[in-house]
Swiss-Prot record:
The gene is ispG. The keyword Membrane does not apply. Converts 2C-methyl-D-erythritol 2,4-cyclodiphosphate (ME-2,4cPP) into 1-hydroxy-2-methyl-2-(E)-butenyl 4-diphosphate. InterPro entries: Dihydropteroate_synth-like_sf, IspG_bac, IspG_bac-typ, NO2/SO3_Rdtase_4Fe4S_sf. Keywords: 4Fe-4S, Iron, Iron-sulfur, Isoprene biosynthesis, Metal-binding, Oxidoreductase. PANTHER family: 4-HYDROXY-3-METHYLBUT-2-EN-1-YL DIPHOSPHATE SYNTHASE, 4-HYDROXY-3-METHYLBUT-2-EN-1-YL DIPHOSPHATE SYNTHASE (FERREDOXIN), CHLOROPLASTIC. Belongs to the IspG family. This is 4-hydroxy-3-methylbut-2-en-1-yl diphosphate synthase (flavodoxin). Its EC number is 1.17.7.3. One of its GO terms (biological process) is isopentenyl diphosphate biosynthetic process, methylerythritol 4-phosphate pathway. Pathway: Isoprenoid biosynthesis; isopentenyl diphosphate biosynthesis via DXP pathway; isopentenyl diphosphate from 1-deoxy-D-xylulose 5-phosphate: step 5/6. It comes from Stenotrophomonas maltophilia (strain K279a). [4Fe-4S] cluster binds at residues 311, 314, 357, 364.
Length: 421
C-alpha cells in the first residue's frame, strides 16, 4: 500500500489527535463538522414509497439514537412519499433530519416532485452515476440548483463500487506516462478522491457555499479506506462522512468498520459516521446505530450510555451468572438512559463493572463508578460492591441482580444532578 500523504505525528500522551478543522454544515437541527461532536447516522431498508413501513423504521432508528436517517429516493413514488413521511414523523414528535439518497435520476425526481426537495434536510449525490458523458455536468448542476433554491446541504459521496469510469481511465492513462507509475490500487484511490473533490469544487462554482457540502469516498477495504480519508482530509476542509461501504454481516462487518473508522477517528478525521452492516435474518436495523455509538464511546469521542466492563470468563468462574448479570445491567442502563439524559445529565459517562472472580474483580470494580466482583470457584459465596473505589456493601443470596441494579439507580439519583422540570 502507498499512503498518498504523510501521516501526522501522534500526541505524546494517551489522547487522540485534535479534531480536524472543517466547515460547519447545518443539516436540519443537527450541525456536522466545525468542531461539533461526531454525528451518528443510519439508513432505512424499506421501500420508501411504503410510508407506514418507512415511518416505523425511521422512528426505530431515531429512538435507538440515530441523529440523521437516509432513505432511498429512486422513483417518483418514493419522492412523493418523502413529505408525507416527514409530516407523520412530526405528528409523532420526531424531528430527525432525513437525507435523500439519489442515484442516476435524482434531477428528474426532484423536478417531478419539488416538495421532496423542500422536505429533505440533505441530498446525497453520487458523482459516479449522476450522469454519463455530456449529460453528467448538466444533471449534476440541476441537483445543485435544487440545493441552492431550497437552502439544502449535499453530501457528495463517491464510492469505488460506482466510480466515475471516465475519470478512472483518464488517471490510468496519466499514470502510464509517469517515470515511476503508481500501482493500480493507488490510481483508483486517487480517482475516488478526485471524483469527490472535483465535484465539490464544481458545486461551489455553481453557487453552493462550502458550508453546505459534506464529502465521502467509500471503499470496502480497511487499509484502503484509511489511506483514502487521510489523503482527503489533508486536501480539503470540507466536513467528512465516514463509512466502510458494504462492511458485511455480523461480527465481520462490526470488526471491519471499527478497525477502519477507529483509526480515522483517533486521528481527528470524520464528522459523521454510519456503520453499514448487513442485518442478520431477524435482526433489528438499529444494530448499526448501537455499534456506531459504542465505537464513538469506546474511542472517547462521545458518551451515549454507561458501558459495562465485564470479564470473558475462564475456569475460575463458577457459573454463567456474571455474564447474565452483565447483560441485565447493560440492558437496564440502555432502557433508563432516555430518562436519565433528561433528569440526570452526565449519567451517560458512568462506568460499571461486572466481574467473575477475585483475580481482577476487585481491582476492575474499584476503577469503575460502580463495580461488583462475583465469587469464582472455591471463593466465599459473596459479591463485594465497590462505589467510586471504595467497598460499599457485600451482596449475598438469590437477589444479587436486583440489588445491584437498585444500587446503580440510587447512585444515578444521588450523583447526577436532576434538572428542573
Amino acid at each position: 500500500m502507498h499512503d498518498a500523504v504523510t501521516r501526522p505525528t501522534p500526541p505524546s500522551d494517551a489522547t487522540a489527535w485534535p479534531r480536524r478543522q472543517t466547515h460547519a454544515v447545518q443539516i436540519g437541527g443537527v450541525t456536522v463538522g466545525g468542531g461539533k461532536p461526531v454525528v451518528v447516522q443510519s439508513m432505512t431498508n424499506t421501500d420508501t414509497s411504503d410510508v407506514a413501513s418507512s415511518v416505523k423504521q425511521v422512528a426505530e432508528l431515531w429512538r435507538a439514537g440515530s441523529e440523521m436517517v437516509r432513505l432511498t429516493v429512486n422513483t417518483v413514488e418514493a419522492a412523493a412519499a418523502i413529505p408525507r413521511i416527514v409530516d407523520k414523523l412530526a405528528m409523532m414528535g420526531i424531528d430527525v433530519p432525513l437525507i435523500g439518497d439519489f442515484h442516476y435520476n435524482g434531477h428528474q425526481l426532484l423536478t417531478a416532485e419539488p416538495a421532496c426537495a423542500e422536505a429533505l434536510a440533505k441530498y446525497r449525490i453520487n458523482p459516479g452515476n449522476v450522469g454519463f458523458g455530456k449529460k453528467k455536468d448538466l444533471q449534476f448542476a440541476q441537483l445543485i440548483e435544487f440545493a441552492i433554491r431550497y437552502n439544502k446541504p449535499v453530501r457528495i459521496g463517491a464510492n469505488w463500487g460506482s466510480l466515475d469510469q471516465a475519470l478512472a481511465a483518464k488517471l490510468m492513462d496519466e499514470n502510464n506516462l509517469r517515470e515511476q507509475p503508481w500501482d493500480a490500487g493507488r490510481v483508483l484511490r486517487e480517482a475516488l478522491i478526485r471524483s469527490a473533490l472535483d465535484s465539490a469544487e464544481q458545486a461551489v462554482e455553481l453557487g453552493l457555499p462550502r458550508d453546505r457540502i459534506v464529502l465521502s469516498a467509500k471503499v470496502s477495504g480497511v487499509q484502503e479506506l484509511i489511506a483514502v480519508y487521510r489523503d482527503l482530509a489533508q486536501r480539503s476542509d470540507f466536513a467528512l462522512h465516514l463509512g466502510l461501504t458494504e462492511a458485511g454481516i455480523g461480527s465481520k462487518g462490526i470488526v471491519a468498520s471499527s478497525a477502519a473508522l477507529g483509526v480515522l477517528l483517533q486521528e481527528g478525521i470524520g464528522d459523521t459516521i454510519r456503520i453499514s452492516l448487513t442485518p442478520e435474518p431477524g435482526q433489528s436495523r438499529t444494530q448499526e446505530v448501537i455499534v456506531a455509538q459504542e465505537l464513538l464511546q469506546t474511542t472517547g469521542q462521545r458518551a451515549f450510555t454507561p458501558l459495562v466492563t465485564a470479564c470473558p470468563g475462564c475456569g475460575r468462574t463458577t457459573s454463567e451468572f456474571f455474564q447474565e448479570l452483565a447483560k441485565v445491567v447493560q440492558n437496564h442502563v440502555r432502557e433508563k438512559m432516555p430518562l436519565w439524559k433528561i433528569h440526570h445529565p452526565g449519567a451517560e459517562n458512568m462506568t460499571l463493572a461486572v466481574m467473575g472472580c477475585i483475580v481482577n474483580g476487585p481491582g476492575e470494580s474499584r476503577h469503575a463508578n460502580i463495580g461488583i466482583s462475583l465469587p469464582g470457584t472455591g471463593e466465599t459465596p459473596a459479591a463485594p460492591v465497590f462505589v467510586d473505589g471504595e467497598k460499599k456493601v457485600t451482596l449475598r443470596g438469590d437477589n444479587i441482580a436486583q440489588e445491584f441494579v437498585a444500587l446503580i439507580d440510587d447512585y444515578v439519583e444521588h450523583t447526577y444532578v436532576r434538572s428542573a422540570g
